[in-house]
Amino acid sequence: KIGLAVKQDQLRAGDLVFFKTGIFSRHVGMYIDKGEFLHVSSSNGVMVSNLEDSYWRSAYWKARRVQ
């Protein structure tokens, strides 16, 4: 509930993007630009991924802008 809700087509660098990756699992990343976001994988460490990748597109939940 902290920050402002942001529509996916209005994302800016630094916005937090949230994903539902399972029934009780959540994942968060930080938007960079041009569909890319930075996040940490327990198996691969720090990664850059794209919101348009099929996995992330289907798991996308919401975004927040913290000021």
What is the predicted role of each segment?
Residues 1-45, 53:
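...with weaker cross-activation on analogous glycine-rich loops/strands in unrelated enzymes
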